[in-house]
């Protein structure tokens, strides 16, 4: 079954190539003797079956450059590693080139299909589709982001400035009580030079008085000294008076202690009458009564 299928595929590919040759000779005047092309030289019979799956993508070739493009196609087949997407791209480019004309055939045929970056570098129009719209969106996003950042920075700058102004105002404006104190201090400082100036004037005027004192002034000074001595002697107590006061205070303390002792003992006696101690006075009275009872009475 596999051998029959491969042989049938091989015959089909040969028929396709013969039809392409006939179309070339009929349309452009191409003669096979000038540019011979043998499919056996390029593709072996075993590999023809793999090419059949993608052979229907190939457009009808027109012009003398068709054989060269087919040769390049089969040479690139091994490099594409049986990738159907790459093969479809190649067939689409060939069909587009046939529709447009053969002027750009060589440029498209020389493209490297494996390197997608080279394709995009040579034809940037396919890569730059819809880029203005994307760029506009990106620019808008960047503008909004920058606006937000500027707003945040402006707020952050405004807040510290306001706080700094408030701090400066608070530092510059002292509380009312400190302001009053500073005002009084300022007034006192202003009064100090005046007071010093008056003292200096008095000192300067003092030598103008006569150096000798009057007799009346001397008498007044001596009287004042005597009165001060009397008051000091009256205020300072004498030693006799001090000893008398000490004795009276000691006697007062003794009387207070005696009174407290009697009060305590009397209270204890009232609370415990059976255990109350007998005083010496009571003992003496009892003895006297006992002596009287023991006397010998005369007989009648």
From Swiss-Prot:
Alphabetized PANTHER family for the sequence: CHROMOSOME 12 OPEN READING FRAME 71
Region (Disordered): 167-186, 224-244
InterPro entries: DUF4640
A Pfam family reported for this protein in Swiss-Prot or TrEMBL: DUF4640
The name this protein goes by in its record: Uncharacterized protein C12orf71 homolog
Organism: Rattus norvegicus
Bias (Polar residues): 224-236
